[in-house]
UniProtKB/Swiss-Prot annotation:
Pathway: Lipid metabolism; phospholipid metabolism. Keywords: Cytoplasm, Lipid biosynthesis, Lipid metabolism, Phospholipid biosynthesis, Phospholipid metabolism, Transferase. It comes from Cronobacter sakazakii (strain ATCC BAA-894) (Enterobacter sakazakii). GO terms for cellular component: cytoplasm. Catalyzes the reversible formation of acyl-phosphate (acyl-PO(4)) from acyl-[acyl-carrier-protein] (acyl-ACP). This enzyme utilizes acyl-ACP as fatty acyl donor, but not acyl-CoA. This is Phosphate acyltransferase. The gene is plsX.
């Protein structure tokens, strides 16, 4: 297999190198063909590589960065002052062809702005969208976008997201003629914001799209659609609410009845139920699907949760590997040519 090189913004996220560097070593252990460029402060990175063996170090390179983009800085300010930052350098490595993808847990708005500036959107796309693939109760997967890259979206942007999501479901997940729905407050055609209703009218005119109408948030994990489209504000709130509920549920499975004296048979039954339910619902654990792809760019960019732990950030690295191997940006660009007008 051909070696694959990824650029990691090691300094991004709530925990910085303390999480991203161990996750990088974990990813190297899992993939012998993977090479990583660790972009950040060498003084912060080097001590965390003490446990890396010679073989791992041979597939690692530290790229020095002078600064870190703060999580609370405005995107426009972040882009203006981004030179020398770990996020910008990681994206520049992709632009220069030294890396095939970039992964960052940093400021979402800054990542969006810099990626659009440096890597450029594909023809016909106004703005990229953050997309992830969520598991549902049918043991299948649903493509969901936008998850926060664009807080305010008009109908044209929502229609473009729908087309990109449909292409990703078909090309990356192998779903033939994927069903596409708009997230709304009801299934009736008269409900929702003007932008959603106008987007619905647009999607009905796209012959290559299997548009099925509106879907409500309580049906997100039911498997009723293969692609779910919304603006970034709604998508981000929906995703984080779902993740919070799932984490609480999984936590309750582990802690139920702790601290109380129980008979041996009750404890045995409890342990069996916990294991059974944990296996049944483990595929919903947010750590297992961390990493949202910034879809619609000419290169591959993966946004990790800022609060991701080591396991979750390693999953984001794996998401980048899969996106590159499947040539997601190239396939999307090729498919969009037939359904979207060229930008001037």
């Amino acid at each position: 297999m051909t070696p694959l090189t990824l650029a990691l913004d090691v300094m991004g996220g709530d925990f910085g190198p303390a999480v991203t560097v161990p996750a990088a070593l974990q990813a190297l252990n899992s993939d012998p063909h993977l090479h990583l460029l660790l972009v950040g402060d060498p003084d912060a990175i080097t001590p965390l590589l003490a446990r890396a063996d010679f073989e791992q170090r041979s597939r690692l390179q530290i790229i020095a960065a002078e600064s870190v983009i703060a999580s609370d800085v405005r995107p426009s300010q972040a882009v203006r002052n981004s030179r020398g930052s770990s996020m910008r350098i990681a994206l520049e490595l992709v632009k220069e062809g030294r890396a095939q993808a970039c992964i960052s847990a940093g400021n979402t708005g800054a990542l969006m702005g810099l990626a659009k500036l440096l890597l450029k959107p594909v023809d016909g796309i106004e703005r990229p969208a953050l997309v992830t693939v969520l598991p549902h109760q049918q043991k299948g997967k649903t493509v969901v976008l936008d998850l926060g890259a664009n807080v305010d979206c008009d109908s044209t942007m929502l229609a473009q997201f729908a087309i990109m999501g449909s292409v990703m479901a078909e090309e990356a997940l192998g779903i033939e003629n994927p069903r596409v729905a708009l997230l709304n407050i009801g299934e009736e055609e008269t409900k929702g914001l003007d932008s959603i209703r106008d987007a619905a009218a647009l999607l009905k005119t796209v012959p290559s799209l299997n548009y099925i109408g509106y879907l409500e948030a309580n049906e997100l994990l039911t498997g009723k659609t293969d692609v779910l489209v919304c603006d970034g504000f709604v998508g981000n709130v929906t995703l984080k609410t779902m993740e919070g509920v799932v984490r609480m549920f999984l936590s309750l499975l582990k802690s139920q009845g702790e601290g109380k004296k129980r008979s041996w048979w009750w404890l045995l039954l409890k342990r069996w139920l916990q294991k059974s339910l944990s296996r049944r619902f483990s595929h919903l654990n947010p750590d297992q699907y961390n990493g949202a792809c910034l879809l619609g760019l000419r290169g591959t960019v993966i946004k990790s949760h800022g609060a991701a732990n080591q396991r979750a950030f390693a999953v984001a690295i794996e998401q980048a590997v899969q996106a590159v191997q499947r040539q997601v940006p190239q396939r999307i660009a090729a498919r969009l040519e037939s359904v979207l007008p060229k930008s001037d």
